[in-house]
Amino acid sequence: MKNIIYPTFIFLSLFTILLGDLASPTPFTVRQPNGMELNIFIRGNHLRNWYEYHGWAIVKNTADWWVYASGVDGQKLLASDQRVGIDPEPDHNLQLSGITGKLIPEALVLEDDAPIPDLYSTRDDTFRVPMILVEFPDYGATYETSKFDSLMNYEGYTHLNYSSTGSFRDFYKEISYGQFIADVDVSDWFMAEHNHDYYGYNNGYQRVKRLVRNMVDSLEAAGFDWSIYDNDGDGYVDALNLAHAGPGAEEGDETNIWSHKSSLGNLAVTYDGVTISSYNFNPEKQMGNFVCIGVLAHEFGHALGLPDLYDTDYSSTGAGKLALMASGSWGTTGTS
């Protein structure tokens, strides 16, 4: 593989990358305290996201009412006293007449100092990838390990009722013209130390990073050999994958973990002569079903240096549904 050129991977790695999954394109239902149901959207990604109703930014106030946003304060939207679905929408509401365009919060900054794999220097065409499955004391897994093994590795894998969708391995083999063969070793389900909501997106990322480190330590204690996952010989595990029980926060419930790629920072650890730092986290489920390869391939793409190609302010569709690093991460979920 040393003489093989990957022009797309090299070119895209020059861009500034956001490293997370785009929010679900499907609305979901919430209830106001009076019982009224609203169909709303979550927008953005793991660094900047907000909720919308009929295109207007909304927030939940301290009394659990969904209200229209009145402004932006850094990484937060400000709540008005105008209730969604009850009071007039901003373009017909004198109390919100100062809103002249989309209200979008500022983005978080999530540092990622892990090196990008050097695909010129990989040992051969096979790129070995570890995958850890994580469940919680109060939120167990639904699907067996064998289901993930098929999703990641089985040639000709079929997802739900779609024909010949292919596996994670099939996808990367096809787009590389047979020159990049992912070989994913899927673990058993490991139990997290804390309950599900402790690691939720609404509690920040440090708890998730600690969870990743704990899972790495658990595998090391079980005799795992990390050295075989340094494909380019730079002393780092190239792309640690994890999947957690349940759906991701990108579907609207921010007590879940938002799918993303990052690094462990000061929690990085060296086992078997290689350092484990780079990781990506994915959900077990999407839209109520078993997860599709889209989000897994998307986050893994970040580990290879690929940028997000969606538009985070929704002024355009970005690269669209057929691009893995745009809305393609939702392919075969029933949303597109």
Q: What feature does the model see in each segment?
A:
Residues 19-278:
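Zymogen propeptides/activation segments of proteases
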Residues 8, 37, 45-49, 313, ...:
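A broad, structure-centric signal for solvent-exposed, well-ordered loop/edge residues
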